[in-house]
């Protein structure tokens, strides 16, 4: 289910103080990066991903990450993407 504008705004505010937990390197979005993002989303629900120079531009890399994982792209600001996937149970974001 897509996020509403209000939900995106709340997630952006919560994600402001987060540090990137996954870094996309020179190889771009690979299977290993997608697996790392999925694991981080399982652990944290809301994550930042740092996108360095690579074969794709930052918009393409962020889209690949959101399509390759069950995550929603909340924001792309510069080279940092904010991704969100709500857990089915035990979610910290039940009030969204």
Residue ranges of predicted features:
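Positively charged, polar, low-complexity stretches
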Residues: 1-96
């Amino acid at each position: 289910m897509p996020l509403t504008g209000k939900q995106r705004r709340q997630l952006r505010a919560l994600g402001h103080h987060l540090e990137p937990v996954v870094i996309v390197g020179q190889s771009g979005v690979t299977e290993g990066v997608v697996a790392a993002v999925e694991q981080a989303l399982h652990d944290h629900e809301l994550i930042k991903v740092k996108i360095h120079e690579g074969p794709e531009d930052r918009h393409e890399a962020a889209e690949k990450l959101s399509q390759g994982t069950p995550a929603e792209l909340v924001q792309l600001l510069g080279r940092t993407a904010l991704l969100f996937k709500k857990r089915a149970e035990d979610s910290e974001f039940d009030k969204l």
